[in-house]
UniProtKB/Swiss-Prot annotation:
GO terms for cellular component: cytoplasm. The record marks E333 as: Important for catalytic activity. It comes from Myxococcus xanthus (strain DK1622). This is Fumarate hydratase class II. It comes from the Bacteria. The keyword NAD does not apply.
Amino acid sequence: MSTKNVRTEKDTFGPIDVPADRLWGAQTQRSLQNFAISTERMPLALIRALVLVKKAAARVNVENGSLAKEKGEAIIRAADEVLAGQHDAEFPLSVWQTGSGTQTNMNTNEVLANRASELLGGERGERRKVHPNDDVNKGQSSNDVFPTAMSVAAVAAITEHVLPELKALRDVLAQKARAFHDVVKVGRTHLQDATPLTLGQEVGGFVAQLDHAKGHLERTLPHLLELALGGTAVGTGLNAPKGYAERVAQELAQLTGHPFVTAPNKFEALAANDALVQAHGALKGLAAVLFKVANDVRWLSSGPRSGLAEITIPENEPGSSIMPGKVNPTQSEALTMLCAQVMGNDVAVTVGGASGNFQLNVFKPLIAHNLLQSCRLLADGMRSFRLHCAVGIEPNRPRIQENLERSLMLVTALNPHIGYDNAAKIAKTAHRDGTTLKETAVALGLVTPEQFDQWVRPEDMTGHKG
């Protein structure tokens, strides 16, 4: 690194050269040197949550007199610049770092301190007017501020992205269920023909699954809204002023619009990440629902001539580089793949959540990275599936009727009239001889044509009343 392009910063390990045009300081530079691992960077959503916490803390520290007003206002201005996306390149650290997130906390402290110093007419580096630890990090420890940022980021991702997209997809499918209420079709269990239902009932099942998934996810929010800040190093609150935790939680609630509160037990809040594990469990549950929905849509649209072909889906792009005219269920494929990724992420989050030792969980960056990735994947995936697939689902009525008329399981309607064994005999004989159920039932002398027409009415077998 050319001496013309660097400045020297110091930490407790001594001096280190830092790129002159960067706002970060010594500890960030050491992390870049010591943890050049893979390409995953700390999510910007987490960085912005951490900056929000710093902003709220600065307000409270000015209010309680522990931070000079001039410094506090400069920190807040610097924080607002970061929140506006002006300094994204100043947060280069890898997810794969210290398990407490200390290096990212210090990265944030250094950037805000150097920028605040500039805003006060000072310099970056040793002669800065705002100190990263004494001012920006006042009343905090990485051990409480990082999990607080994790909670803030998780609540935002779930409430502002995942839940709205879940509702939007649910509403589109609910509209389809109503539109298809009178389309009687073959049911299928074990991938085999079963008794009839309506396409509306089938899609309505998807809607109910999504409603339950939404409820499960919403029920994880109260625990996520409990913030670790104020526990400082081990949960005792050492060096945090009285009332500090409560006031910062109030400030964060005001800044975000989410009802954050201080955690009633800071030892739990630092030593464990149970709220995030449980939230990700609900995300995994949503992924399982979406996987099932996407897979059923894929199967029901299979064809167009040799598959089930009971529904049609939008044709968005060519499907094959060798087979002309082929169109594939690409939205279902993308959605099922990302759901598989979320399921894999859940394993990592679970292991991370189980890996606390004594007073601190040290898998926090892993948990945050995977949870925020899962939220992004699910929100984007639901939006894409809704806009490019679900809104265009339509029944292929001729094919549905053809499959329905060929189904041997319509014979189930005869059970109350001729008994299970006789009904089974009709189905097996018709399947063996390639004849219709009606032809076989009459030939076997078990029913008259009039009785068959009266008793075997698919629309009466669905429980649908109008």
